[in-house]
């Protein structure tokens, strides 16, 4: 018998647990739409999740095929999980337990965006849609029933905390935020929540910079004036979605010359915090005197400082995940059973139609009414015969008793080639 009652799921990727920012950057797929289009030829369903600290590929397919596909794409050093380990991982991910900043809320939106991209690309099968929606639902429940997202709960807010730790206080400091997308909004909000007033927002689209600056009581900066404002700033937090660096080494070298007063021997220190993926700031700025560059890798220490207070909340979250995981697996088993039972009903319908036509052919005299009655009768008999057994098959599949479910299928379909067991 072909493999039934199972939806093969596999997930592969890398994350902050085992990869630094350079490794993540190298693994990233710059053209997500092209990747999904190519993967669609190999798998029934594909979803690509790319965040600041993880790149993961979820497919309806087997782990070996996924591993081979990624290796063909020049990606190595990733981990692969399959089967019922996949839904549990997605639950932990959505709950924020697996995040760099434990409890962060942004992962929920990122999962939704990845799902929307897969739907737009035509790579979202029903199983993947079910997985992501269920994971997001569970993530919302964890945050509602625990305080796991208390404190610095985003990469953006953690970047602000890092700047605060480095300087002692951000009061009377000039802070420049480069980028006004989702991460830029989080950074700006975290700054505004501290009552800071010297906040500047730069964005390639000036109107978006104005909108964000107005919301937080800051000042919008035209992107052509970026380096002039970097020269005036104490801290620059950069988080654009540009595919290439926007803050270059030679330009920062010139900026630092402007920060050197005639009687000073050293320029004023400049803190650059790059939380973009791919990177916004060229690595070469580290060689410039007075420049201090920090990246997502440096945010781990900020997270470690808050972990102790969240440990009990994480334990509570795992309890919720245990409950959700059991229900999640049952849903996937039921979905797999429904796919198999759809095949069963298709098979039964072909037999019903064949026998109906044979019966009608044997009647010497028949009219439309007779044909309608016989058609209704055969429909009713088929559904009645299958009703109880399909309920039993579905129940067995849901609780993981695949052996019994397959035995029931054999009992019904033995002798028919579409379900014949190949021994």
Swiss-Prot record:
It catalyses: (S)-4-amino-5-oxopentanoate + tRNA(Glu) + NADP(+) = L-glutamyl-tRNA(Glu) + NADPH + H(+). Its EC number is 1.2.1.70. GO terms for biological process: protoporphyrinogen IX biosynthetic process from glutamate. One of its GO terms (molecular function) is NADP binding. PANTHER family: GLUTAMYL-TRNA REDUCTASE. Possesses an unusual extended V-shaped dimeric structure with each monomer consisting of three distinct domains arranged along a curved 'spinal' alpha-helix. The N-terminal catalytic domain specifically recognizes the glutamate moiety of the substrate. The second domain is the NADPH-binding domain, and the third C-terminal domain is responsible for dimerization. This is Glutamyl-tRNA reductase. It comes from Methanoculleus marisnigri (strain ATCC 35101 / DSM 1498 / JR1). The gene is hemA.
């Amino acid at each position: 018998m072909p493999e039934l009652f199972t939806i093969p799921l596999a997930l592969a990727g890398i994350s902050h647990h085992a990869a630094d920012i350079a490794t993540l950057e190298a693994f990233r797929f710059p053209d997500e739409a092209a990747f999904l289009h190519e993967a669609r030829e190999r798998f029934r369903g594909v979803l690509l999740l790319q965040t600041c600290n993880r790149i993961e590929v979820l497919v309806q397919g087997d782990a070996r095929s996924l591993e081979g596909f990624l290796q063909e794409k020049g990606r190595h050093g990733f981990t692969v999980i399959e089967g019922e380990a996949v839904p549990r991982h997605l639950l932990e991910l959505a709950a924020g337990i697996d995040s760099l900043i434990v409890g962060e809320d942004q992962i929920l939106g990122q999962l939704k965006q990845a799902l929307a991209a897969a739907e737009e690309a035509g790579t979202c099968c029903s199983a993947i849609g079910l997985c992501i929606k269920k994971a997001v639902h569970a993530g919302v429940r964890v945050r509602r029933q625990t305080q796991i997202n208390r404190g610095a709960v985003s990469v953006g807010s953690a970047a602000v905390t890092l700047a605060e730790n480095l300087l002692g206080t951000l009061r009377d400091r000039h802070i420049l935020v480069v980028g006004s997308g989702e991460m830029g909004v989080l950074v700006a909000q975290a700054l505004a929540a501290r009552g800071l007033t010297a906040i500047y927002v730069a964005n390639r689209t000036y109107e978006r910079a104005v909108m964000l600056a107005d919301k937080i009581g800051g000042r919008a900066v035209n992107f052509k004036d970026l380096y002039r404002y970097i020269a005036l700033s104490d801290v620059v937090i950069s988080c654009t979605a540009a595919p290439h660096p926007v803050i270059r080494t030679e330009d920062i070298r010139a900026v630092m010359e402007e920060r050197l007063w005639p009687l000073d021997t050293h320029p004023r220190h400049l803190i650059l915090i790059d939380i973009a993926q791919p990177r916004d700031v060229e690595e070469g700025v580290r060689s410039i005197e007075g420049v201090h560059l920090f990246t997502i890798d440096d945010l781990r220490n900020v997270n470690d400082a808050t972990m102790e207070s969240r440990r009990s909340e994480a334990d509570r979250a795992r309890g919720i995940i245990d409950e959700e995981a059991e229900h999640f697996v049952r849903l996937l088993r039921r979905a797999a059973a429904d796919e198999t039972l759809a095949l069963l009903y298709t098979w039964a319908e072909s037999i019903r139609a064949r026998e109906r036509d044979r019966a009608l052919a044997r009647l010497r005299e028949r009219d439309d009414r007779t044909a309608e009655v016989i058609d209704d009768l055969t429909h009713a008999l088929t559904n009645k015969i299958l009703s109880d057994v399909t309920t039993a098959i579905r129940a067995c599949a849901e609780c993981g008793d695949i052996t019994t479910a397959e035995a029931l299928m054999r009992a019904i379909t033995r002798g028919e080639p579409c379900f014949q067991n190949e021994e």
